[in-house]
Every structure is written in C-alpha cells, then in structure tokens.
C-alpha cells in the first residue's frame, strides 16, 4: 500500500452536504485567531481585495457560530489539480482508495482523509497569522511529522514546497516525490499549470490502475506522460510528456 499527500486549493465548489466533524483543539485555536481579524485585516493577511475579504469574514463567522455547511474535502476543493482528479462515478475500489490512501494537507485542519468534512474557507501556509506565537508551519510541524513517523507504508508527495516545508527536514527526506515536465523540441520545461493538471491526472491513473507499490507507479502512463528513468532517482519520480511542434 502507498499513501498520497495532496495540497488544498483556494477555489471551492460546494457539493453534497455532509454531517459536521468537531474541530480539533489545534483548529479551534486557529479559528479563534481568524475570527478576531477584521475585513481589512483579512484583506492584508490574504493579499486580496476588500470585497473578497468580506466574503472570507462571513465564512469565518459562520464557522465560529457553528452555522457553516460541511462538505467532503476532496469534493469541495475545486482547483486545477482537483478538477483533474476522478471524483464522480467511482467504483467501490476507487472510492476506497480515495478514502484510505489519499490525505489532504491543510493549514486549518492538519492532515485529513480525502472525504473528511470541512467548511468553505480560505487558508494556507502563506496566510499571515500567528497562533500561540508561532507561524502556521511551525504550529503544525509536530503533527505533520507524526503522520510520517507513524506511517508504515511509503508516502508519496504531490505537494508544492509550501506544504513540504512544514515537515522537519529529516522526515521530509522520507517522502517520495513526483515531478512532471514537458519535452518541447528536446528542452524540458515545467510550470505550475502543467504540474497541477498532471498531479490530478496522475492520481486518477494510480486510482484506476490500483497501484500499490512505488514500482507500479513507474510503470504508469497517462495523458501522454511517461516515466523517465534517466531523470529519476530512488525517491524522485519524473514523468515527461512530449509536445509536438506546432
């Protein structure tokens, strides 16, 4: 068996409502700090326009009041990566895979299972807020480290450095990483759009093929991406897609 870590997303799209889950003490402490912030404070913390900050203020107030609706995390997040993850018409095996092998790294909830019930909110490790005098990365480090320390199976990171940096450097080395590139006339290139789409497509391929070992991941091909042994190492997997000349 393998576990996969994926990031959260700013873009959200409410789906079918589910029962709520009591917030952990660590999340409650973050909620307390976020609820103290005014619309202007949120505008600065998020680096967004005042009208957008007003929407976020309403969301935090609703969570604080216990009035916010809850949705499965993997269905609520709707960023580019998530839109490329198969989330509808899942077979029993595919849903079981998402339920037990895919975990989402959140700066508000911690590391949660894919279908964990969450509320609409905007929060990531770039959010300028301190909890108990700590940055969000330091605040969550012990719990993130514990996830890796207690994992009895390989953990594959589909995270950006923003999320990987939460783990202690010594434990971060335990992660298997996956990178995606395009071959344009012999020149290898990558950028965030390629990576986000490919992460979702990769996870879908893993789910559909029921890959349960790192070697099985190396055998995958999807969306014209193929494993490149010459670029890869024992813990780093590179997949490249050739782009035809226009």
UniProtKB/Swiss-Prot annotation:
NCBIfam families (alphabetical): PRK02101.1-4
Any Pfam family matching the protein: H2O2_YaaD
InterPro entries, per the entry: YaaA
Superkingdom of the organism of origin: Bacteria
Homology family: Belongs to the UPF0246 family.
Cellular component, GO annotation: cytosol
PANTHER family in UniProt: PEROXIDE STRESS RESISTANCE PROTEIN YAAA, PEROXIDE STRESS RESPONSE PROTEIN YAAA
Protein name: UPF0246 protein str1967
Entry's Gene Ontology BP terms: response to hydroperoxide
